[in-house]
From Swiss-Prot:
Source domain of life: Bacteria
EC nos: 2.7.7.6
Keyword Nucleotidyltransferase included in the entry's annotation: yes
Gene Ontology terms describing biological process: DNA-templated transcription
Organism of derivation: Hamiltonella defensa subsp. Acyrthosiphon pisum (strain 5AT)
Protein name: DNA-directed RNA polymerase subunit omega
């Protein structure tokens, strides 16, 4: 069973509430398969993997914000292409 020192992860992020938000976001990315784990999985659940990545300093709030911005840009491009392709049919 994996042991995660939550206190070390809290120190990396700043406070426990921010840790929860960052860990949940990262766990969802891992669960959806959009990103791969940065640490050995060792049959751990995605929440444990996310906490271990944060504890080791591999994932930070700023990295996730950059990822969100990139995903938003991709989504906007897809929406624009969809809009332009539907306008071609009109």
């Amino acid at each position: 069973m994996a042991r995660v020192t939550v206190q070390a992860a809290v120190e990396k992020v700043g406070n426990r509430f921010k840790l929860i938000l960052v860990a949940v976001h990262r766990a969802r990315l891992l669960q959806s398969g959009r990103e791969n784990s940065l640490v050995p999985e060792e049959n751990d659940k995605v929440t444990v993997i996310a906490l271990r990545e944060i504890e080791q300093g591999l994932i930070t709030e700023s990295i996730l914000k950059e990822n969100n911005q990139h995903e938003d840009q991709i989504q906007k491009k897809v929406q624009m292409k969809t809009i332009s392709s539907t306008q071609d049919f009109d």
